[in-house]
């Protein structure tokens, strides 16, 4: 048996663009992807902190150190430029693997620069 666990998270990223006329996906700064352990074409869940929307899409790599967080295609209707979002990916692990696993959690500032990188998330410890 396997269970689904949080693998990677980019917390409170700022949407820099919403491009309705592009073919699907979310474009993420490649540097942020690397630090958060998110791969190109990986499925991610997006949560918009400002409007409460939750949806899934896949990742394409943006220019390194650009700070780009761009929702493309139909997903562009779910956010607005300037919205704060949480980007999460998941993995399937056995119970034994899950008990030893820690996610990669990346906190960014208003310009999508890395503020903190951790391998845990505990209630009340990190805002």
Curated annotation (Swiss-Prot):
Cofactor note: Binds 1 pyruvoyl group covalently per subunit.
EC number: 4.1.1.11
GO BP annotations listed: alanine biosynthetic process; pantothenate biosynthetic process
Cofactor(s), names only, from the UniProt record: pyruvate
Pathway(s) annotated for this protein in UniProt: Cofactor biosynthesis; (R)-pantothenate biosynthesis; beta-alanine from L-aspartate: step 1/1
Active-site feature positions: 25 (schiff-base intermediate with substrate), 58 (proton donor)
Catalytic activity, as annotated: L-aspartate + H(+) = beta-alanine + CO2
Subcellular location: Cytoplasm
Pfam families: Asp_decarbox (PF02261)
Recorded GO MF terms: aspartate 1-decarboxylase activity
Record's keyword terms, sorted: Autocatalytic cleavage, Cytoplasm, Decarboxylase, Lyase, Pantothenate biosynthesis, Pyruvate, Schiff base, Zymogen
One GO term describing the cellular component: cytosol
Pyruvic acid (Ser) PTM sites in chain numbering: 25
Post-translational modification comment from the UniProt entry: Is synthesized initially as an inactive proenzyme, which is activated by self-cleavage at a specific serine bond to produce a beta-subunit with a hydroxyl group at its C-terminus and an alpha-subunit with a pyruvoyl group at its N-terminus.
Binding residue positions for substrate: 57, 73-75
Top-level taxon in the UniProt lineage: Bacteria
Alphabetical list of PANTHER family matching this protein: ASPARTATE 1-DECARBOXYLASE
Subunit structure: Heterooctamer of four alpha and four beta subunits.
Family: Belongs to the PanD family.
Function: Catalyzes the pyruvoyl-dependent decarboxylation of aspartate to produce beta-alanine.
Protein name according to UniProt: Aspartate 1-decarboxylase
Species, as recorded: Clostridium botulinum (strain Langeland / NCTC 10281 / Type F)
Phylogenetic lineage: Bacteria, Bacillati, Bacillota, Clostridia, Eubacteriales
Protein's gene: panD
């Amino acid at each position: 048996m396997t269970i689904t666990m949080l693998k990677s998270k980019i917390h409170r990223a700022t949407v820099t663009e919403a491009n309705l006329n592009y073919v699907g996906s979310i474009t993420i700064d490649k540097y942020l992807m690397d630090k958060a352990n998110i791969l190109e074409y990986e499925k991610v869940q997006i949560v918009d902190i400002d409007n409460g929307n939750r949806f899934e899409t896949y990742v394409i790599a943006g220019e390194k150190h650009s700070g780009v967080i761009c929702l493309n295609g139909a997903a562009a209707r779910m956010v607005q430029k300037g919205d704060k979002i949480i980007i999460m990916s998941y993995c399937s692990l056995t119970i034994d693997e899950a008990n030893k696993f820690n996610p990669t959690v990346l906190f960014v500032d208003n310009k999508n620069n890395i503020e903190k990188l951790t391998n845990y998330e505990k209630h009340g410890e990190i805002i």
